[in-house]
Every structure is written in structure tokens, then in C-alpha cells.
């Protein structure tokens, strides 16, 4: 169910989907954080009330740019004008470029309206845009491996709470901020990467059915056939249980108000 960076799907899950355990959804992880940061337009859900089943992996987002753009390093991003593609509000491709532009005053133009990652990659190849920020590293090396392997795409920045072992020499965004309050706010925004591939059921599902869904998810994450297929597709499996995802939301909702306010301002200021 496409639309508005998963907003349509999540609103449906929360308000209209059956509440008997037969309806589950996965969606862009960033959208569930929007109301927590004060962006409530169009949202018809409370993420804390969803029945979280688990997340297949945590994630490292990257800024990936075409080599033809002339942007090859983080230093280049700070000094040379470039265009970045985006999809819907709340999607990583929208949120992370805005935060980067706001924090570091990048000479970046955001080109919104793309219907997903594949469309943005085509736009890059056509030179409509120069790249993407918030691009899932695992997606890049699986779906667009040829572009990266042939050197057509250059990775200039990691967007996560910790570096990926594949990218030891690529800067990590949280290492680039010295101000403690700004760093805390940035980490609040970036924490969505810890639930990179989330699954949830609507509120109101009977507890025993939620427990069954969680057990099935956990069993799948250990299933040899599933893991082998994921490996063939170059998709990482670093699961978080439903309880762990719920704990993350509990931690976020307990964040100090000044940190939440600053995180919201990082996104709002340059929208």
C-alpha cells in the first residue's frame, strides 16, 4: 500500500485493519517517529500503541552520490552544490537530508516526489539528481550492487549510531557533532535505524495472538532456510524482538523535552 512514505499504510493498519492477528504490516521506519517529533499532519496513529512484532535488522544509512556529480567525500558535500532525491515526508530519504542540511549548512538542494528508491536511482543515472542520503547500505549493496561495485556510486557519509564494518573509513554522522545537546537530538533522530525493518500489528489484537506472532517472528529469524535466502540476496539479518522494539519507543518517549524540541527543530527549520 504505497503513499506518503508509508503514512497511508500505517494509518490503515492502525485504524482499519482487522484486530484479530491476521493483519500485519511493515513500513518505512521513520514514519512512526514523526508524531514524536511534533509532525502530526496526516498522522492517525500512536506508535506506542502498536503491537510490535519485531524488526529484521538494524541499519546503516548512507549518502551515496554518482561519481559524475563531482562529490566524492564528506568535505565535498560541505563545499560543492548538489541535488539529493527524496520521497515522502517521514521517509529516511526526506528526513536525513533535511537534518544534514540544517546541522552542517550544506549547499544541498532537495528534490522531492520520487515514488521510491528504484525511481531515485533511475533519476541519478539520468543525472536529474546527484544522489541519495538515508540510503540503506544493505539495499545499496544488494539491489544496486553493480553501480557501487563499478565505482559509479561513491559513499560519503554513514547515518547511524555506529559504523558498519564494511565502511571503516567513511565518516559517521554522530562523530561530526561536538555540541552535547545537538548530539543528543541527532541520536534521537538516528535511533530509528535500530528498527530498520519493523513489523507491527494494530492495537487491540488479543495478547495471546500478539505473543504467537512474536514467537513466529523470532523463530523465522533463526530459521536456516530464511537466513540462507537472506544471505543470497545480500540482506543482513540483525533482529530485534518485539519487546526490544517496544523498549526503544519507551526510551524515546522518555527523552528530555529540550532534546525532543531540538530534534524537532532540526527537521522543521529547513522544511
Segments (PLM) and residue ranges:
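Short beta-strand and adjacent tight-turn residues that come in two discontinuous sequence segments
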Residues: 26-27, 87, 113, 133-135, ...
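Early extracytoplasmic/lumenal segment of secretory-pathway proteins
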Residues: 1-11
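PG/GG-rich flexible active-site loop of Rossmann-like NAD(P)H-dependent oxidoreductases
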Residues: 3-4, 27-32, 204, 270
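A ligand-binding cleft/hinge motif common to bilobed small-molecule-binding domains
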Residues: 29-41, 94-103, 131-176
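An extracytoplasmic/periplasmic, membrane-proximal ligand-sensing/linker region
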Residues: 149-152, 156, 176-178, 205-271
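Hinge/capping helix and adjacent helix->loop/strand transition within the periplasmic-binding protein
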Residues: 12-23, 31-127, 173, 177-184, ...
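Short loop/turn segments at beta->alpha junctions
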Residues: 5, 115-116, 241
Amino acid at each position: 500500500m504505497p503513499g506518503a512514505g508509508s503514512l497511508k499504510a500505517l494509518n490503515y493498519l492502525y485504524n482499519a485493519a482487522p484486530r484479530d492477528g491476521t493483519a500485519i504490516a511493515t513500513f518505512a521506519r521513520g514514519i512512526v517517529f514523526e508524531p514524536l517529533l511534533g509532525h502530526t499532519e496526516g498522522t492517525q496513529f500512536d506508535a506506542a500503541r502498536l503491537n510490535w512484532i519485531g524488526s529484521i535488522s538494524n541499519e546503516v544509512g548512507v549518502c551515496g552520490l554518482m561519481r559524475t556529480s563531482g562529490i566524492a567525500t564528506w568535505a565535498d558535500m560541505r563545499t560543492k552544490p548538489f541535488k539529493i532525491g527524496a520521497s515522502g515526508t517521514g521517509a529516511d530519504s526526506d528526513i536525513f537530508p533535511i537534518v544534514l542540511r540544517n546541522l552542517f549548512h550544506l549547499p544541498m538542494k532537495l528534490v522531492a516526489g520520487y515514488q521510491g528508491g528504484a525511481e531515485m536511482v533511475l533519476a541519478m543515472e539520468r543525472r536529474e539528481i546527484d544522489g541519495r542520503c538515508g540510503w540503506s547500505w544493505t539495499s545499496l549493496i544488494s539491489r544496486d550492487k553493480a553501480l557501487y561495485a563499478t565505482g559509479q556510486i561513491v559513499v560519503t557519509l554513514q547515518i547511524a549510531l555506529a559504523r558498519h564494518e564494511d565502511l571503516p573509513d567513511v565518516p559517521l554522522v554522530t562523530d561530526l557533532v561536538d555540541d552535547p545537546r545537538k548530539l543528543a537530538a541527532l541520536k534521537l533522530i538516528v535511533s530509528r535505524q535500530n528498527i530498520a525493518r519493523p513489523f507491527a500489528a494494530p492495537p487491540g489484537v488479543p495478547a495471546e495472538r500478539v505473543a504467537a506472532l512474536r514467537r513466529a517472528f523470532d523463530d523465522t529469524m533463526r530459521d536456516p532456510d530464511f537466513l540462507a535466502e537472506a544471505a543470497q540476496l545480500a540482506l543482513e539479518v540483525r533482529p530485534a524482538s518485539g519487546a526490544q522494539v517496544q523498549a526503544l519507543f519507551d526510551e524515546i518517549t522518555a527523552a528530555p523535552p529540550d532534546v525532543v524540541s531540538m530534534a524537532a527543530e532540526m527537521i522543521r527549520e529547513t522544511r
